[in-house]
A protein has these predicted regions:
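Short runs of predominantly hydrophobic/aromatic residues within well-ordered alpha helices
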Residues: 1-4, 96, 114, 138, ...
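Structure-specific DNA junction-binding interface
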Residues: 1-66, 235-238
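Generic structural signal for hydrophobic core residues of well-folded globular domains
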Residues: 5-13, 80, 103-106, 121, ...
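Helix-hairpin-helix/helix-loop-helix acidic hairpins
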Residues: 57-107
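Active-site-adjacent structural elements in folded domains
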Residues: 82-90, 98-104, 125-129, 168-180
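Helix-hairpin-helix
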Residues: 99-121, 141-142
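Phosphate-backbone recognition surface of nucleic-acid-processing proteins
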Residues: 118-176
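Low-complexity, acidic/Ser/Thr- and charged residue-rich accessory regions of DNA metabolism proteins
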Residues: 172-238
């Protein structure tokens, strides 16, 4: 399960997952072979198919000596699981931050990517960490926070995200907002972090005079025509 989560998240593209699934009996550590996976992905690239989602930038250095980003990511997975047996370490972690510190020490994994990975791991059944103890402000969130506050005082960016999480209900009431939860689940730290990121994107269009190192929206949203059947982590009990 952990291998599947990390493999999907490194590419973060459903069509890439389906491509691999169509070429192998199943996506598991038993079927994982760096050369075989690389061949499938390289063939897709040669046919003009994008294998990475551009929602966020994944690190693209040659940490494992390969010219292609996907080859370095496959080598990373091989080191994590076949050499280091990272799954044995992760399942023993008591907190999200503990797992974050393990993952972020690997090449090609920055702080925000490590946070995204541990968040997705925590949605699974293999661990059950608290979600309200740890967060990391990503690049978009940092820009969003900067556009909201002239002076943060002594608060860190993560402190601001935590404050938003802790005071959400009283602020909804104060602002007379009828906020619709997913089930009975309040906004979590990752949700508040994401809100600041989306705010940054919104402000680029709505208030372009606000200074930022990002000016344009790099991708336009195109809704799918097919109906989406949403599923939620079992532990949410929705």
């Amino acid at each position: 399960m952990l291998f599947r989560i990390l493999l999907f998240k490194l590419f973060n593209k459903e069509s890439t997952w389906e491509l691999l699934l169509n070429n192998f009996e199943d996506i598991t550590l038993k079927t994982f072979n760096v050369k075989d996976y690389s061949k499938v992905l390289e063939n897709a690239i040669s046919n003009g198919i994008k294998i990475y989602n551009d929602a966020y930038i994944s690190c693209a250095n040659k940490a494992f000596g390969y010219d292609r980003k996907h080859d370095n990511h496959l080598a990373l997975l091989n080191k994590m699981f076949n050499e280091d047996r990272i799954e044995e370490k992760i399942v023993k972690c008591n907190t999200m931050e503990e797992a974050f510190n393990i993952i972020k020490n690997y090449p090609l994994i920055g702080n925000f990517m490590a946070y995204q990975l541990v968040t997705d791991i925590n949605y699974s059944e293999i661990v059950n960490w608290r979600e309200d103890e740890f967060t990391v402000a990503g690049p978009g969130s940092l820009r969003g926070i900067k556009k909201c506050f002239i002076d943060k005082g002594k608060m860190s960016n993560e402190d601001i995200i935590k404050y938003m999480y802790e005071h959400q209900d009283e602020e909804f009431k104060r602002l007379n907002l009828d906020f619709k939860r997913i089930g009975n689940r309040p906004l979590q730290l990752i949700d508040c972090q994401n809100i600041f990121c989306e705010l940054d994107k919104y402000c680029r269009q709505a208030i372009p005079d606000l200074k930022s190192n990002r000016i344009k929206i790099k991708k336009r949203y195109s809704p799918k025509k097919e109906k989406i059947n949403y599923i939620y982590p079992t532990k949410w009990k929705i």
